A protein has these predicted regions:
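N-terminal nucleophile
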Residues: 1-141
Length: 141
């Protein structure tokens, strides 16, 4: 229900969110915050809780209980690298130059492996993954 791609310079994401019985909505999954870029995938409500927890300082003892179910991922991209938060308050640092997440990640990973940009990778995923689409947002770090 999401595809988010990072190519080392640009973060891109589709805009489709599916609620209830399959109604599609258009949303923004990525944003700039201070000196980093944030992206959420998975359950929208849980992802937003993770994002807001991070923006308030990522206090370990204040980690959202709903996130412990591992239904969403928060991606944080900064000049120091890339990290993800999922079911706990400690990030997983990712050393790879390229990264993608969400249901369209395999298509995006393959596209970037073949030299496509993050935006182009999201475009490819939106063609082949039926729950990705509704446009693309992108932010350059």
């Amino acid at each position: 229900m999401t595809v988010i791609a990072w190519d080392g310079t640009t973060l891109a994401a589709d805009k489709r969110a599916i609620s209830g019985g399959g109604i599609c909505r258009t949303v923004k999954k990525i944003e700039r915050f201070d000196n980093c870029l944030l992206a959420i995938s998975g359950s929208w409500d849980v992802g937003v809780e993770l994002r807001e927890w991070f923006k308030k300082g990522a206090i370990v003892n204040a980690f959202p209980e709903s996130a412990r179910k591992d239904e969403a991922t928060l991606l944080v991209v900064g000049h120091g690298g890339l990290a993800t938060y999922a079911s706990g308050p400690y990030p997983m640092s990712v050393e790879d130059t390229r990264y993608s997440t969400g249901s369209g990640r395999d298509f995006a990973e393959a596209a970037m492996y073949l030299g496509k940009t993050a935006r182009e990778a999201v475009e490819v995923a939106c063609v082949f993954q039926s729950d990705c689409g509704n446009g693309i947002d992108e932010i350059v770090l």
